[in-house]
A protein has these predicted regions:
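Surface-exposed short loop/turn segments
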Residues: 58-111, 121-124
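A structural "domain/chain start" motif
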Residues: 1-47, 147-159
Length: 159
């Protein structure tokens, strides 16, 4: 089947980070994209990356389709990474991270979304918060790709 072999080009935006603290954005982006590329290298998908971050909760369809068009992408993923503060330190976060993703087609239609809560999944959270971001991102991508596989290829939506 010729359709199966087609490499899907997926455009990833920078994750929106909650709480909105400059200091944690850089490490979050790094951990997020490292998990994405680890994940996609095993698959026939190509990661495209834009340094743009758009609000997870108010996504404009036209913006998505413009980005997909300009980057020749088949899909777009808008991620969000939510941290939980613990203790009274300025940047003391627990290992619990929720990674949310919304998957859009090239026209900017929402196909599916998922939340991956590292705490709820009862992962034995060892190590750093960065590690949790990777685990969460990995989990969220797997969910999204599972959904993606359920979508039947049909001529008109270009899969």
């Amino acid at each position: 089947n010729n359709h199966e072999a087609k490499i899907k080009r997926i455009l990833y935006f920078n994750p929106q980070v909650e709480p909105d603290i400059e200091e944690i954005k850089e490490p979050t982006n790094t951990a997020f994209f490292s998990a994405v590329s680890d994940n996609l290298s095993e698959r026939k998908n190509k990661m495209l990356k834009t340094e743009t971050q758009i609000s997870f909760d108010s996504i404009d369809q036209k913006t998505i389709s413009d980005y997909c068009l300009n980057n020749d992408a088949d899909f777009a993923v808008i991620p969000k990474v939510k941290y939980f503060k613990v203790g009274i330190g300025k940047y003391v976060f627990s290992n619990q991270v929720i990674v949310s993703m919304k998957l859009f087609d090239a026209e900017g239609n929402l196909i599916t979304e998922t939340d991956y809560d590292t705490y709820r999944k009862n992962m034995r959270l060892l190590g750093s918060t960065v590690n949790s971001v990777k685990i969460g991102t990995d989990g969220a991508i797997k969910e999204i790709l599972k959904q993606l596989r359920k979508i039947k290829p049909s001529g008109e939506n270009g899969f």
